[in-house]
Amino acid sequence: MSSMTPREIVHELDKHIVGQQDAKRAVAIALRNRWRRMQLPADMRSEVTPKNILMIGPTGVGKTEIARRLAKLANAPFIKVEATKFTEVGYVGRDVESIIRDLVDVAIKLRREQAMKAVQYRAAEAAEERILDVLLPPARDTSEEESKHESSTRQIFRKKLREGQLDDKEIEIDVAAASVGVEIMAPPGMEEMTSQLQNMFSSLGRERTKKTKMTVKKAFKQLQDEEAAKLVSEEDIKTQALETVEQNGIVFIDEIDKVARRGNVSGADVSREGVQRDLLPLIEGCTVSTKHGMVKTDHILFITSGAFHLSKPSDLIPELQGRLPIRVELQALTPDDFERILTEPKASLTEQQQALLKTEGVDIQFTQDGIRRIAETAFDVNERTENIGARRLHTILERLLEDVSFDAGNDTSSIRIDGAYVDAHLGELAKNEDLSRYIL
């Protein structure tokens, strides 16, 4: 679990996301509260439940990006799902409990990586010995003199191995045979049975090994992974992963507005109100059965987000609204925001384009007025057509640099992208509403 303070979390998010300070502060406080809760005595800890969040804002302003970056910072089991993927129990589609099953799988993978990292040094030593056994097979019935000589030869080879002098040498080693891959098409709601059958089939022949030729460098990596897997306990990993999911798990549900009842629409809302009602016990706290054991969802943090351009947060069923007490509104982007998005974030869009074309020897320079014109064009097109937020910048940059990208590689050159260049390449398209609707 990350022990970063809210200010540090916001500072990290600022490196990648422009503006939206309210949303950043809300998720930073929620993440820090997870850490604070873990410092409490056990009896008090069980009483403190997370305050779930609803992020509201137009598309392309940073809701999903905040979730992506938060996942990297959290150092806790984190899963992002779209609400539109799920349907009411009994209908074709995934039921909402599969969110928790997927979260458990993520936690086990995370815990296994941590456990294997902890035994990496011992695994490397064991892998080294196995490679030396292949390079210098131990002789039978050797005298004391011969065994001393063999030991000194082994040390010479060990030194060469550690220095990388034997990396390209090809050897034949015994590696664990790949498990049998079985794909089972199961009806909705039967994922549990499917996973159990897949586990049963994959365990067949797990103990078998096969001889494989590979370089010492590849063999060392493979043997190290094998040895690390022997040193860690799968049972402990599962137990700790389930505990981590219950105490620190975070679920991000995107497109929550798409399952809200829209105004005066009548008819069966299979994938709407039913999904909301199925989400209620999950968010409130219930016990979900997974193939690894039972998981209580009482202390899992749920962050939901939606554009709400065809519906309103009040269109969600009242019970669900009550379980999302923290509301954060994200602001629509201005030309100044677009300008900052092009230059400020780590690995910004302009830096990415410069780096890509530099591989072909093309040097691109964006001037300040060029960046301003790109930002203004993106804002204008968003205002006159569909507002897709910062995603519009991708479309405009690709269109602007289309000719440069096509001719790159034929000759090395330096291109200066200023206001005049942007107007020459995008001016007519941006002004013509019919064309910009389809091309930009």
Swiss-Prot record:
Keywords: ATP-binding, Chaperone, Cytoplasm, Nucleotide-binding, Stress response
GO terms (BP aspect): protein unfolding; proteolysis involved in protein catabolic process
Major subcellular site: cytoplasm
Assembly and binders: A double ring-shaped homohexamer of HslV is capped on each side by a ring-shaped HslU homohexamer. The assembly of the HslU/HslV complex is dependent on binding of ATP.
Family that this chain belongs to: Belongs to the ClpX chaperone family. HslU subfamily.
Xref: NCBIfam families: hslU (TIGR00390), PRK05201.1 (NF003544)
Keyword hit for Chaperone: yes
Subcellular location: Cytoplasm
Gene: hslU
GO cellular component: HslUV protease complex
Organism domain of life: Bacteria
Protein's UniProt name: ATP-dependent protease ATPase subunit HslU
Protein's job: ATPase subunit of a proteasome-like degradation complex; this subunit has chaperone activity. The binding of ATP and its subsequent hydrolysis by HslU are essential for unfolding of protein substrates subsequently hydrolyzed by HslV. HslU recognizes the N-terminal part of its protein substrates and unfolds these before they are guided to HslV for hydrolysis.
Entries under Pfam families matching the protein: AAA, AAA_2, ClpB_D2-small
Source organism phylogeny: Bacteria, Pseudomonadati, Pseudomonadota, Gammaproteobacteria, Cellvibrionales
Protein residues bound to ATP: V18, G60, V61, G62, K63, T64, E65, D254, E319, R391
